[in-house]
Amino acid sequence: MPTGKLRQKPPYAAIMTNSPVTPSTETQQPKRYARFLPQEADAPPVEWLITEGLTDYEEALAFMEARVQAIREGTASELVWLVEHPPLYTAGTSANAEDLLTPDRFPVFNTGRGGEYTYHGPGQRVAYVMLDLKRRREDVRAFVASLEQWIIETLAAFNIKGERREDRVGVWVVRPEKPRLADGSMCEDKIAAIGIRLRRWVSFHGIAINVEPDLSHYGGIVPCGISEHGVTSLVDLGLPVTMGDVDVALGKAFESVFGPRQTK
């Protein structure tokens, strides 16, 4: 992994929205937003779709665009779509060109999501989250905190303690077995990334959890613009889990945080 100093950025940098954001005095306390349930007791369940094999990234973008439009128009239900992609890099709206270290290594896609550079590839579970926040809460920071909570509860099913950081969106794992950083602080690795976009309060893009990707593929970028910390995966942490195991845990944790889902 590249080394260097952590480039400071504001919290929730992995957000891109063209929906109005109302400031809240509570947004400094993400734990208060552990649940992001529908406001209506009889709200329909969220559709839960798993696609086997590797999904072309451009096809995934086109699918999300169409689905978000349909959700806005009321002709389709909310959806969480679980996929894997072939190896590729994506650039968010805050991406710094200098953080793309080997531009010819894998295809690079510019996306409308918030955030910087990240990697997608086999062994990583990507969950595209298409929810209508008007049905829940028009609070972007609360939504991101709930996505973090979803990941944290998923990892807890495997006895992994995932942690959030106020200045770094995503979920982190403390690595006490690794050498401490130059400032004496404990080493931390990122195990899950978050990058979203909102269109009139309907979300798309989502989260990515490292199950068993080739971690060397991250060497072509500075992940999320953070060079001081590395990346890890469930298998890298010594857990012989499968993608199916993770999908089960994701489903249970989703219902805890966001409410009922329906598989097809």
UniProtKB/Swiss-Prot annotation:
It is an enzyme of class 2 (transferase). Pathway: Protein modification; protein lipoylation via endogenous pathway; protein N(6)-(lipoyl)lysine from octanoyl-[acyl-carrier-protein]: step 1/2. GO terms for cellular component: cytoplasm. It holds the Pfam family LplA-B_cat. GO terms for biological process: protein modification process. One of its GO terms (molecular function) is lipoyl(octanoyl) transferase activity. Gene3D superfamilies: Bira Bifunctional Protein, Domain 2. The keyword Acyltransferase applies. The record marks K190 as: Lowers pKa of active site Cys. Substrate binds at R113, G114, G115, E116, Y117, T118, Y119, H120, A193, I194, G195, G206, I207, A208. PROSITE patterns: BPL_LPL_CATALYTIC, LIPB. Keywords: Acyltransferase, Cytoplasm, Transferase. Residues 74-262 form the BPL/LPL catalytic domain. It catalyses: octanoyl-[ACP] + L-lysyl-[protein] = N(6)-octanoyl-L-lysyl-[protein] + holo-[ACP] + H(+). It is found in: Cytoplasm. Its EC number is 2.3.1.181. InterPro entries: aa-tRNA-synth_II/BPL/LPL, BPL_LPL_catalytic, Octanoyltransferase, Octanoyltransferase_CS. The active site is at C224 (acyl-thioester intermediate). Its main location: cytoplasm. Catalyzes the transfer of endogenously produced octanoic acid from octanoyl-acyl-carrier-protein onto the lipoyl domains of lipoate-dependent enzymes. Lipoyl-ACP can also act as a substrate although octanoyl-ACP is likely to be the physiological substrate. In the reaction, the free carboxyl group of octanoic acid is attached via an amide linkage to the epsilon-amino group of a specific lysine residue of lipoyl domains of lipoate-dependent enzymes. Belongs to the LipB family. PANTHER family: LIPOYLTRANSFERASE 2, MITOCHONDRIAL-RELATED, OCTANOYLTRANSFERASE. This is Octanoyltransferase. It comes from Brucella melitensis biotype 2 (strain ATCC 23457).
